[in-house]
Amino acid sequence: MSKTDVTKLETESKKLDLSKAYDALFSNASTSKTYTQCNVFSSGEKKHEDAKKLCSKLLYILEDIAKSPKSTENVKRCSYLPYWFYDQIRGIHTEHSKKIGEISFIKELTDIRKNVYKNELKNMCEIPYDKDVNLDEWRKRKLSYIYFKSHDNIKNISISTKKTECDKHLAYVDSFTPLYKEYYEKHCRSGGFLWFSPVGTDYFRCISSYEPSKLLAELKLCKPPEPPKIRTSASSALVSGKAGGATPEVYPDRVLM
């Protein structure tokens, strides 16, 4: 199994702006002025200015979602929140291969989120805390999540006649294939229990219709329509000959009776 080139996959994804719509859901996030829990990062051993800013922004987002949790936009925000959150962590913590459990302020942040939601907001947007997972893994999970959310739109591109767009998406799907195979082996193998059909995770679906190979085959067939062929009939050729053929001869000495 070929290793996933995460940098290449991320580059191809950015070329198509696939995560833009999801990142935009958090673009107007401000800071919470309601809760003081984030002050734990203001001083002492836990002092961490970037963690405090992220904490306040996170609580603001959660407050906003809680106002209308069932709206289409907020359902999307809630679903994408874990990937946004760990993406923000990647921006303020440079040791991306370090396990989550070894980065102390992450546990503090997720506990604050849990306590605020449990005791005050009464609505839960999950942010999983797996101490044995690192930030590099969360980067791959985000890319996988985006693929499955973009699948149907890519399929529509594949049946279009826009060759340039097809080629761009072809490069993207091709770069995702190694990660798909990696996660399929991890999440979709039944382990010998034939009666058990795994469904996958939030970021990976064990459904054959999502296989990249199927999208690749369709994208490779994508081509612009051929220009209509001009058919020349015998009658049109005759008319053409009369209109633009030889000039009739003129006999000046011949007298017509």
Regions found by a protein language model. Give the residues of each.
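Long low-complexity, Ser/Thr/Pro- and charged-rich intrinsically disordered regions
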Residues: 232, 255-257
